[in-house]
Structures are given as C-alpha cells and as structure tokens.
C-alpha cells in the first residue's frame, strides 16, 4: 500500500516500478491499495487497484474520510480492503507517521506485515521503533536506514535488508563502463 501508482510523487513512482516488476514475474496475486487514488481507477493496469478516496458525490464517505488526517493514508478503508482481498502479505513503504496505524487494525492478525519505513535520520522516535518491532519484517531504502533500524531495534526488529528505489530501465540506461573509462582517460 502506498500512493497511487500513477501519481507523480516519490511513493507513487516507487509503487509503479515495484508493482509492475512483481506482476511481470507472474508469481503473485497483487492488489494495490492506492492512497489518493479514486475508487474507479486501475482499469489501465493488470492488477487489482483499491482506491482510497471517497466515491464522488458520496457525502457520507467524504465526511468519514475528512474526519481524521490518517484517513488519507488508508486507515478508514484498510480493513474493508483486507477483508475483500485477504492478503497474505501487506507491504508498505512510507513514513512511519503515515502507516503506523496498521499495527492496531482489526485485520492485523491475518497478514504478514512487511514495512520499509523512510529512515533518514537518527535516532528514530521511540514509539516508531516500538511499532517497527511489531512488523513481521522490516526493510530500508538505504544502508544508513538499515543500520539505524538494526542499532535502535536491536534484536526486537526483524530487519531483512535494503530495497533501494529502482529506476525505470526504459528511461535510464547505464553507459558502458569501459567506454566511459576510455573517454575519460582512466585506465
């Protein structure tokens, strides 16, 4: 779960690249729970998409959505999505304050929670570390983040490694290393 795969945001781009690549393996049944995504989105991709925004012209849903700031991140619709899709694994990769509510959801006992929280400073807030300890697995965007998680979480967190953001291989192509070395006069 993250921001909608079609948004021009860091989390949206990460969602697009990750879900597209997972889908191409043909190993997984995937669903995207898309923050800032409309309920009728997802017709352009081969995986299931659950939009988090309230349905247009549904005042009751809008009132619920607007009643709590965490609802923009999915807290108001998460359990309903889990009951419908019945995931084995819920993967999220956003800031701790965006996803820490997952720990207290009614459906939490029924899925494995894998989280890659943004860790770009040290120390992390103690309440976040306590939440990290309740995840089934933790990843980090960077080696620095992984080191912080391991040091602060000690044996309480299950840090499994880094999953640095990928690039779009159709846009960013590496230059041949030997050609660059020759052009720069590096032996």
Task: For each feature predicted by the language model, list its residue ranges.
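N-terminal subdomain of nucleotide-sugar transferases
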Residues: 1-41, 45, 85, 137
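Extended catalytic core of nucleotide-activated donor transferases of GT-like folds
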Residues: 42-137, 143-147
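Cofactor-binding loop segments of dinucleotide-utilizing enzymes, especially the Rossmann-like FAD-
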Residues: 3, 35, 118, 143, ...
């Amino acid at each position: 779960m993250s921001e909608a795969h079609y948004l021009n945001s860091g989390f949206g781009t990460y969602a697009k690249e990750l879900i597209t690549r997972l889908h191409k393996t043909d190993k997984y049944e995937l669903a995207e729970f898309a923050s800032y995504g409309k309920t009728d989105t997802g017709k352009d991709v081969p995986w299931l998409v659950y939009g988090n925004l309230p349905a247009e012209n549904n005042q009751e849903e809008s009132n619920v959505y607007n009643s709590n700031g965490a609802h923009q991140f999915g807290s108001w619709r998460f359990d309903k999505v889990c009951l419908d899709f019945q995931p084995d694994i819920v993967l999220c990769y956003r800031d701790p304050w965006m996803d820490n509510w997952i720990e207290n959801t009614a459906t939490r006992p029924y899925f494995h929670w894998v989280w890659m929280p943004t860790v770009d400073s040290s120390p992390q807030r103690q309440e976040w570390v306590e939440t990290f300890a309740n995840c089934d697995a933790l990843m980090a965007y960077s080696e620095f983040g992984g080191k912080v998680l391991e040091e602060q979480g000690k044996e309480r967190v299950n840090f499994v490694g880094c999953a640095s953001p990928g690039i779009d291989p159709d846009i960013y192509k590496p230059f041949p290393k030997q050609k660059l070395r020759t052009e720069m006069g590096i032996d």
